[in-house]
From Swiss-Prot:
It is found in: Cytoplasm. Belongs to the chaperonin (HSP60) family. It comes from Corynebacterium glutamicum (strain ATCC 13032 / DSM 20300 / JCM 1318 / BCRC 11384 / CCUG 27702 / LMG 3730 / NBRC 12168 / NCIMB 10025 / NRRL B-2784 / 534). Keywords: ATP-binding, Chaperone, Cytoplasm, Isomerase, Nucleotide-binding. The gene is groEL1. This is Chaperonin GroEL 1. Together with its co-chaperonin GroES, plays an essential role in assisting protein folding. The GroEL-GroES system forms a nano-cage that allows encapsulation of the non-native substrate proteins and provides a physical environment optimized to promote and accelerate protein folding. GO terms for molecular function: ATP binding; ATP-dependent protein folding chaperone; isomerase activity; unfolded protein binding. It holds the Pfam family Cpn60_TCP1. It is an enzyme of class 5 (isomerase).
């Protein structure tokens, strides 16, 4: 492939245009009075959403130099979403503002390396300030506030808070579509563990990047599955019965894995393979727990059950299983409540009888997994477009609520960042030259989220930012009521974890862009295609 190369100012300007294109599409959604964006989907109706990361994921630009910029900022949104699950719009905006500020200074002759030192120091300072301003979140009402701000929907806020209360702040909360138009919460028996799919080809729900299996056959295998002849007879039985299949084994490798991937791509069978979690005896014990939850029999040569002889009697099942990149959630396993309770009793006895603290901790962890239960929020709405939009909001709300419970909250509406920016301006005096410019660049960028929240509400952003800067910690502008006041009491709050990861990811990408001296892209394909056509004139 031929490449195109741009240097210096050209390279950076192309990147900036791409950054702006993506960020401008995302920033209209910011704040309680933010607007929606409509995404055209190849399948099904268009998606109307105000979820920053969903919009960002959908954007690819035609101009390859601009697309580099768009993809860089997209990575900020996606990364922030992975870590904190929310705050993607804020992260995107911060990155855009920092890149624009920084490039302006580079064009005016500032040294990018020195600028970066300033930005790094300012980012460190910002994170310290965020920690210092954090308030702990304890009661359900505060959690409901966080979830409400995130989803802009009080009903969702209350349901998410109720779910967190039932399963604890580390408990599993999943989102499903409801059959009715009501959104409701139910707590079901379920178990989850931190291992995801062995291959991304198993994903069957592209929106959530998960593999979702309804009423699947569950195959638990003690050892590795590495021989195809041993494994094929059982696989064929599943294909015949037309059921989805979840395989949990020490590992699935070589030909068996290839076979599963190929069949998954061809849609011959809905299948997901997952490595069993933990090691040694812990792995063994946990597999036995799973067997009881799903009513499966573990395929284990030690007890005389070989893979090549096993039939459908070894399968367990569950109502629904979702597998993401690093987590598997089994909801409503087929195991009877009595069996599961008996298993819990057995683990409780183990806890009582052991002298080792480590063993006790691990057994308690298993007990918690077995008794935790899983909260399922069933999302209902009148149309499919609305259901999809609401599902995204509920997922954001769950992530925000969990982040708040873990690391506390700060005043929302971008106000805490505006006030931290004031601290940075004073902090900048400790620096010289271009490093000072770098610290100030971040201070300017930190004002942008509040600016756009006010702008989207139809007010003059700069006036709001200037007034907010003078207010004490915890106070700021409430765009929902259009008044200034104590945001923490009004429930306008953001999880520290979300804002923290937004700042970290935005500054890291901005620093990369500022030090870019050349960009290399593939030459667009149309021209190449025409060139080939020229060879056929005999």
């Amino acid at each position: 492939m031929a490449k195109l190369i741009a240097f210096d100012q050209d390279a950076r300007e192309g990147i900036l245009r791409g950054v702006d294109a993506l960020a401008n599409a995302v920033k209209v959604t910011l704040g309680p009075r933010g607007r929606n964006v409509v995404l055209d989907k190849a399948f099904g109706g268009p998606l109307v959403t105000n979820d920053g990361v969903t919009i960002a994921r959908d954007i690819d630009l035609e101009d390859p130099f601009e697309n580099l910029g768009a993809q860089l900022v997209k990575s900020v949104a996606v990364k922030t979403n992975d870590i904190a699950g929310d705050g993607t719009t804020t992260a995107t905006l911060l990155a855009q503002a920092l890149i624009a500020e920084g490039l302006r200074n580079v064009a005016a002759g500032a040294n990018p390396m020195e600028l970066n030192k300033g930005i790094s120091a300012a980012a460190e300072k910002t994170l310290e300030e965020l920690k210092a301003r954090a308030t702990e979140v304890s009661d359900t009402k505060e959690i409901a506030n966080v979830a409400t701000v995130s989803s802009r929907d009080e009903v969702v806020g209350e349901i998410v808070a109720a779910a967190m209360e039932k399963v604890g702040k580390d408990g599993v909360v999943t989102v499903e579509e409801s059959q009715s138009i009501e959104t409701a919460l139910e707590v079901t028996e379920g178990i989850s563990f931190d291992k995801g799919y062995l291959s991304p080809y198993f994903i069957n729900d592209n929106d959530t990047q998960q593999a979702v299996l309804d009423n699947p056959a569950v195959l638990l295998v003690r050892n590795k599955i590495s021989s195809l002849p041993d494994f094929l007879p059982l696989l064929e039985k599943v294909v015949e019965s037309n059921r989805p299949l979840l395989i949990i084994a020490e590992d699935v490798e070589g030909e068996p894995l290839q076979t599963l991937v190929v069949n998954s791509i061809r849609k011959t069978i809905k299948v997901v393979a997952v490595k069993s979690p933990y090691f040694g005896d812990r792995r063994k014990a946990f597999m036995d727990d799973l067997a009881i939850v799903t009513k499966a029999t573990v395929v284990d040569p030690e007890v005389g059950i070989n893979l090549n002889e096993a039939g459908e009697e070894v399968f367990g099942t569950a109502r629904r299983i979702t597998v993401s990149k690093d987590e598997t959630i089994i909801v409503d396993g087929a195991g009877s409540a009595e069996d599961v309770e008996a298993r819990r009793g057995q683990i409780r006895r183990e806890i009582a009888n052991t002298d080792s603290t480590w063993d006790r901790e691990k057994a308690e962890e298993r007990l918690a997994k077995l008794s935790g239960g899983i909260a399922v929020i069933r999302v209902g709405a009148a149309t499919e477009t609305e259901v999809n939009d609401r599902k995204l909001r509920v997922e954001d709300a769950i992530n925000a609520a969990r982040a708040a419970a873990q690391e506390g909250v700060i005043a929302g509406g971008g106000s805490a960042l505006v006030q931290i920016a004031e601290t940075l301006k004073a902090y900048a005096e400790e620096f010289e030259g271009d490093q000072k410019v770098g610290v100030r660049a971040l201070a300017t960028a930190l004002g942008k989220p509040a600016y756009w929240i006010a702008s989207n509400a139809g007010l003059d952003g700069s006036v709001v930012v200037a007034r907010t800067a003078a207010l004490p910690n915890g106070e700021g502008f409430n765009a929902a009521t259009l008044e200034y006041g104590n945001l923490i009491n009004d429930g306008v709050i953001d999880p520290v974890k979300v804002t923290h990861s937004a700042v970290v990811n935005a500054t890291s990408v901005a620093r990369m862009v500022l030090t870019t001296e050349a960009s290399v892209v593939e030459k667009p394909a149309e021209e190449a295609a025409d060139a080939h056509a020229g060879h056929h004139h005999h």
